[in-house]
Amino acid sequence: MGSSILTNRSAMTALQTLRNIDNNLDKSKDRISTGLRIGSASDNTAYWSISSMMKHDSNTMSAVVDAINLGREQVNVAATAVNLTKESLDDIQKSMVSAREKSDDDIMKIQDSIKGNMQNISNAIQSAAFGGKNILSNGGEKVGIAAGYRREGSAVYVDMIEVGGAELNFGVMGPDGTIDMTQGILKGVFGKSDKDIDAGIKTFTEAADKQKGLEDALAKAEAAVAANPNDEAAKTALEEAKKAVEDNKEDWTKAQSDFKVVADSMTLNDFVQMQGVGGLPSVAQSIILNSVQKTVRHAVDVTLTAGSKIGSAVNQVDSQLNFVKRLLDNIEAGIGALVDADMNAESAKLSALQVQQQLGIPRLFLLQIRAARIF
């Protein structure tokens, strides 16, 4: 092709090539600086659209991880409070065992020790709040903890783990911020009997004193006959004493049964408020201590159930947290596979383009000089 004084086609071709090199060089530099080969929709519409949706899912999943971590701490705090409650109840059980056949002063010391442990339980449950929620003082209602995020078509779902229920109902939060423990699973510890305990003790003490008097009279009559077997008066007195004990048997049995009903209604709180326990007839002490010990054992049982329930929740939340973290890692890896630049390849490409640019500029200069020689 001949030369034209109007158009230098070789120079135009070289210039276009140089422009393409510069354009590719800019793209390569941009990929290296950002680390992305798909930075906008113009790079690859399909990949950009998919990766953008995945980035949205990743950001949402990160928020879910934060929510699960918050819920995890709420459950862990509740588990700690339940464990402390169990330890305090164990101490109370030991105190109740040691209360038998003790003086009134010793029993008062035991009552004070039990009061301290009851306060520890109350403090533990009261302090089990985290993030504005207290799983243990929710009146038996379940607390929802974020567990996952999923997209199904155009619908989006946030899955929840429910923690709580009747087994973890230690009380109800009142308007003043205190927890009413009498409405929870430890109502046998913190509640109050619906019976007239003082009247029951008075009635039973009178019956016990009468029975003891009859038994003492029988023992005295038996001793008199043993000392003088031929004493007819002593024999008559013995028969009368036996009859008196027998005649009172039904009343005494009923008195014990009635008092056991009263004692079984007693809470641990009732027991620690009682005065003069050590001065009661031994049979009355025994009935009271047996009933209260049964109440404490029940409290231990329901606390163990609560511990098992909250322990399962801890494991469930931990497992879900690990799963969501792995899922988040997979999403991040998927995004990277779509849009991340191959830095080794881009570096090599950049070097090649820089060489092409360096060679292209002198070539364009030579073509311009050749065209100038025509004139």
UniProtKB/Swiss-Prot annotation:
Is Transferase among this UniProt entry's keywords? no
Arranged from A to Z, the UniProt key words for this protein are:
Bacterial flagellum, Secreted
Report what the protein is called.
Flagellin
Q: Give TM regions.
A: none
Where does the record say this protein resides? Secreted; Bacterial flagellum
GO CC terms, sorted: bacterial-type flagellum; extracellular region
Q: Which family does it belong to?
A: Belongs to the bacterial flagellin family.
Q: What does this protein do?
A: Flagellin is the subunit protein which polymerizes to form the filaments of bacterial flagella. Flagella are an important component in the invasiveness of B.bacilliformis.
One MF term in GO for this entry?
structural molecule activity
